[in-house]
Amino acid sequence: MRDAVTTLIKNYDLTGRYLDRNAMDELKAYFESGSARIAAAAMINANSATIVKRAAAQLFEEIPELIRPSGNAYTTRRFSACLRDMDYYLRYASYALIAADNNVLDERVLQGLRETYNSLGVPIGPTVRGIQIMKEMIEAMAEDSSLNSTDFIASPFDHMTRELSELSV
C-alpha cells in the first residue's frame, strides 16, 4: 500500500529527477488536505455500520429483485455477503482517502474482483450502484459536518466504480 507521497517520490526516483515545482505543489496539497482526509475517514469509521445499512436499504429499494426469491441477495447468507462486501468497499475506500492514493484499492480490492463476481454470478451493476450510494451518503455527511474540503471524497468510490464497470459511468 502506498500513499500519495510515496507514489510521487517513486515516480521521480524512477526517472532520476529531483522534485520540481509540480511535485512540491502536489506535496503541499497532500499535507494541506490531511486534516480533512483524516476527518472524513474518522466520520466513516464512526458511522460505517449505519452507512452500510442505509446504503443497502436504498439499493434494495432501487433494485428490489435482488432480495426476491432467486435474487442475488435472497437468503440470509447472500444478504449477509452483500453487506459484508459493501463494508469491505467502504473500509478500503477510507484507507484510500487517508493515503490520497487509490493504489490500495487496486491491490487489495479490485484485482480479479470482476472476474470472481462474474464466475459466481454476482451482478456487477448493483455492486457499482451500492458503491455510488455510499459515496453519495458520505458526501452528504461531510457537507453536514462542515468539512472545509470534500472534493477528495469521491475519488476512491469513483475509482472502484470505473474499474468494476463494464461500461464507463
UniProtKB/Swiss-Prot annotation:
The keyword Lyase does not apply. A variant beta-allophycocyanin (AP) which forms a complex with ApcE, a phycobilisome terminal emitter that influences energy transfer to photosystem II. It comes from Synechocystis sp. (strain ATCC 27184 / PCC 6803 / Kazusa). Keywords: Antenna complex, Bile pigment, Chromophore, Electron transport, Membrane, Methylation, Photosynthesis, Phycobilisome, Thylakoid, Transport. The modification N4-methylasparagine is found at N72. Transmembrane segments: none annotated. Heterodimer of ApcE and this beta chain. It is found in: Cellular thylakoid membrane. NCBIfam families: apcB. Pfam families: Phycobilisome. GO terms for cellular component: phycobilisome; plasma membrane-derived thylakoid membrane. Its main location: membrane. Belongs to the phycobiliprotein family. Contains one covalently linked bilin chromophore. The keyword Methyltransferase does not apply. GO terms for biological process: photosynthesis. It is a peripheral membrane protein. It comes from the Bacteria. (2R,3E)-phycocyanobilin binds at C82. This is Allophycocyanin subunit beta-18. Disruption phenotype: Increased levels of photosystem I (PSI), decreased levels of phycobilisomes (PBS) and photosystem II (PSII) per cell. Cells are unable to undergo state transitions. When combined with an ApcD deletion mutant the cells have decreased PBS, PSI and PSII, and require glucose to grow.
